[in-house]
Amino acid sequence: MSQAALNTRNSEEEVSSRRNNGTRLAGILFLLTVLTTVLVSGWVVLGWMEDAQRLPLSKLVLTGERHYTRNDDIRQSILALGEPGTFMTQDVNIIQTQIEQRLPWIKQVSVRKQWPDELKIHLVEYVPIARWNDQHMVDAEGNTFSVPPERTSKQVLPMLYGPEGSANEVLQGYREMGQMLAKDRFTLKEAAMTARRSWQLTLNNDIKLNLGRGDTMKRLARFVELYPVLQQQAQTDGKRISYVDLRYDSGAAVGWAPLPPEESTQQQNQAQAEQQ
């Protein structure tokens, strides 16, 4: 190969090499430009999304059947955590825990965020079937909880009493005895169980029953059997049944009380009408 041809070939290779290097450098520069743009854009977008002034959680939507919970209860629970976060930064689990701790009558709460600035909260309240030891309420599953007294003052519920931690046991006894009494149109107004498992009941007509320990259903059946006789005697004597002590193998001790003035007058008028 001649020297001229060799020089030409070397020259072409140098040009090609420079072109390849230039292309490679351009590719690297383009890639760096793209990466820089993505990073900068991502940083800007993230900063924008985290800016509480741009995406504050400013709307509150409450759902679920509510009897005791007010809108302000939820609002104050959230504000107690501090300034609300943004859509991206606010942890809904923290809000959920806060509501459950501050509002003991809430059975279940779910919190979720709705783009761009909405907080949706669904509430499920406990449903009371009786009052428990005056200060609390109890639901059908035996869960005890408290509600501000002023929000339950108009509710007429039976009263249950028992040692701490005995709500389920008292509730079960209340149901069983209530079912037996309902057959004879009695309603339980109060049911109390002592630490020694001794039972005292108050009926809707304010008659108090002392059942003692053990054989409570048997003793309750005895009262149902005796009641017509006792009621007849009460009407004859112009008195009312105050209490019936059934802590005996048979029979019962009965306490009597004067009739209220209105009932006494009504009974006298009825007796006079019958004589005429």
Swiss-Prot record:
Factors inducing expression: Repressed by hydroxyurea.
**What happens when you mutate residue 38 to P?**
No change in activity. Does not insert into the membrane and lack of activity
- So which stretches are on the Periplasmic side? 49-276
| Transmembrane portions of the chain | 28-48
Segments on the Cytoplasmic side according to the record's topology features: 1-27
Comp. bias (Low complexity): 266-276
Membrane topology label: Single-pass type II membrane protein
Q: What is this protein called?
A: Cell division protein FtsQ
Compartments where located = Cell inner membrane
Instruction: Specify the species.
Output: Escherichia coli (strain K12)
The outcome of changing residue 113 to D is:
Impairs localization
